């Protein structure tokens, strides 16, 4: 007689084994109809599996986070059901849930097209309308092998090979189609309604390019039609803002096959990069950082000593010279310790903050590369703070202020903060972990910040705080971080002399605000849709001549503006002024200044903003004053 305890503390007693669906039915028919699965003693369980003992039960519906993930996973199986009905010689690989959706990797000699996506989607809709029950079969490993051998599902058989002999394997039966999964899944297809197949891409079995080439079908699914439509609108907007398209359209950068994952910056894009670097450099100087520059290629012996050679060797680019192996640095920290180690340091010298715009290289898989967002060569706004244990909290607190100041400058007000604490495998004493975690916690709490704890997610050498931005499309980008490190100063012999004249190892704080310049610029391109605020824009103002008579005045104004430090350009082509204004607008120039006979007479310009607002008549001093004010605000609205 299982006693079931519900979330409100109430108990229900059943005379025999009971399923989640039966528990829901005992509460009400409406709840039973909405039930997708359940959580039994904090473990997700299919709605139709019997519960035999006293348990705490939570009923899962589409309103729950777990419910929508189950819906998405069930849709992945529906892809399998549909393609197996439509195409021959299809072999199913894996079909997991991902953020906002799902995908299925499929092996087929036939190459799917966008037209096939429509065909598959139509078949899925047809299957859904039959409202069939999804049966769960819990079988032994031997029986699972037999099932998939009969169906010639070679990839499923490979997955089964890695499953232990003991225990049962969950098979899910969609009419004639059978798939394998940890589960749970929906009990009936009536729970599967609002979905869209999105795109096709290539992949490899288990992500290894030496394995079979697969075809991936992506989809999304939501509990409500409005949620689906809102998501599709966000995708459409994201495609419109895609930094790769805008980068090409506005001549910001390009990437080519001869140098995959490495950026060719064009003058417009490089201007943005330089302005961003200048801004961060100002911030660093204001906060007492010392800027350094370290070598690109370093003998592997340093990487062996730091531990990176053992852990990251496959991700490093290497070269050889005079019988020595060098690694092109994937990170800056070991080199920064070499700078710290030059000369004797006293506790009175700490904290020492060393910063570098460090160019790093990592041998990312070619399939993972994505425009500016995932590259092989990137520049970090990297810094390392060498301090005592007692100084951790103050340094972290100051850094948090710095992060919020910078992000606010770019219009990011919603910052997600996560604190990751000690993992099972770690270096350092429990005492120093206690001190460090307490310091990070206090630094956050003293600022009344909302943050999320991630127990056990810290690095083996220390706890960390991560800062993520939420952009205009509600996408989350992890950019900033501050990481406590007890290990590397010891490994690389970094020491200072304490108050008792004893040598001690400093604590090292790894920290970055932007993460990488490339990725952050990619985020900004999409956030602004290439409509950069005036301080960041490649060209801040363009001067347009109405007739040939006004060309000389345009050129003179332009020269004066450039000599005063503004990024100005001219359009003196023999075109109609309306056409020139449209061109300047399409080029996203923040300020458009028109000079005709009337303006020339009074030595002024007619000024308009990118959004079409008429700003009035400005002579050169007033124009400079206006631009200075806008540039000083750096896009801030307050």
UniProtKB/Swiss-Prot annotation:
Gene Ontology annotations of biological process type: threonyl-tRNA aminoacylation
GO cellular component: cytosol
Binding of Zn(2+), residues: 333, 384, 510
Organism: Prochlorococcus marinus (strain MIT 9215)
Top EC category: ligase
InterPro entries assigned to the protein according to its UniProt record, in alphabetical order: aa-tRNA-synt_IIb, aa-tRNA-synth_II, aa-tRNA-synth_II/BPL/LPL, Anticodon-bd, Anticodon-bd_dom_sf, Beta-grasp_dom_sf, TGS, TGS-like
Chain segments carrying region Catalytic: 242-533
Presence of the UniProt keyword ATP-binding in the record: yes
Residue ranges annotated for the TGS domain, each copy included: 1-61
Major location category of this protein: cytoplasm
GO molecular function per UniProt: ATP binding; metal ion binding; threonine-tRNA ligase activity; tRNA binding
Family of the protein in this entry: Belongs to the class-II aminoacyl-tRNA synthetase family.
UniProt catalytic activity: tRNA(Thr) + L-threonine + ATP = L-threonyl-tRNA(Thr) + AMP + diphosphate + H(+)
NCBIfam families, sorted: thrS
Gene3D superfamilies: 3.10.20.30, 3.30.54.20, Anticodon-binding domain (3.40.50.800), Bira Bifunctional Protein, Domain 2 (3.30.930.10), Threonyl-trna Synthetase, Chain A, domain 2 (3.30.980.10)
Cofactor note: Binds 1 zinc ion per subunit.
EC number assigned by the record: 6.1.1.3
Cofactor requirement: Zn(2+)
Gene it is expressed from: thrS
Pfam families: HGTP_anticodon, TGS, tRNA-synt_2b, tRNA_SAD
Function: Catalyzes the attachment of threonine to tRNA(Thr) in a two-step reaction: L-threonine is first activated by ATP to form Thr-AMP and then transferred to the acceptor end of tRNA(Thr). Also edits incorrectly charged L-seryl-tRNA(Thr).
CDD domains for the chain: TGS_ThrRS (cd01667), ThrRS_core (cd00771)
Keywords for this protein: Aminoacyl-tRNA synthetase, ATP-binding, Cytoplasm, Ligase, Metal-binding, Nucleotide-binding, Protein biosynthesis, RNA-binding, tRNA-binding, Zinc
Record-given protein name: Threonine--tRNA ligase
Compartment annotation: Cytoplasm
Subunit structure: Homodimer.
